[in-house]
Swiss-Prot record:
This is Ion-translocating oxidoreductase complex subunit E. It comes from Pseudomonas aeruginosa (strain ATCC 15692 / DSM 22644 / CIP 104116 / JCM 14847 / LMG 12228 / 1C / PRS 101 / PAO1). Its EC number is 7.-.-.-. The gene is rnfE. It is a multi-pass membrane protein. Part of a membrane-bound complex that couples electron transfer with translocation of ions across the membrane. It comes from the Bacteria. Its main location: membrane. The keyword Metal-binding does not apply. Belongs to the NqrDE/RnfAE family.
Amino acid sequence: MSEQDFREIARNGLWRNNPGLVQLLGLCPLLGTSNSTVNALGLGLATMLVLACSNAAVSLVRGAVSEAIRLPAFVMIIAVLTTCIELLMQAWTYELYQVLGIFIPLITTNCVILGRAEAFAAKNGVLRASFDGLLMGLGFALVLLVLGGLRELLGQGTLLADMHLLFGPAAADWKIQPFPQYQGFLLAILPPGAFIMLGLLIALKNRIDESLAERAKVQAGDVPATQRQRQRVRVTGVIE
């Protein structure tokens, strides 16, 4: 696997084909658990682990599974890995597991995981499949984390609250309150706020993509006629 392959997979997972901002997959957990940073980070890490491990497992067994039972077999693999993550969370982060509730078992049915297993892991080697799962999971987790941080900041005026649920008592003092007198904005932590914030993030990404595309065209010498005309007016003072 070449360095170019690694870069291409990384760009797709983190930005160009991001599961949350481009593919719009996994919206149920993305919107349902992103009301705080700790919830978003906990579910994001769990999803990333399941996605990376399931891609590796699917790639390993892809030659031994027939076409007729491929999807049920993939779902079984994902379900086993999700159960393992669920048991680990019950053992080490039980309070966070209780907060996340049904969203942990629902990782099994997350379209991001099954989609990558079918579209990529079943057609590539273990290394490529594992890296794709890791980067797709990381891209999904980052969107969850940004969304959770923004909603927590706007809704409650805090950041990193209750991080001890994930990292233990040592993280109890990680809470940040930038505006002590801020009373909070209830809409931000309600479901409508999740839709609004996700829409704004998608719009921001699209705008950045447009700016990058325009800059690439300019650097390549493909400047639009109207822009060339404006540049000529600034130089000559004559409108043609």
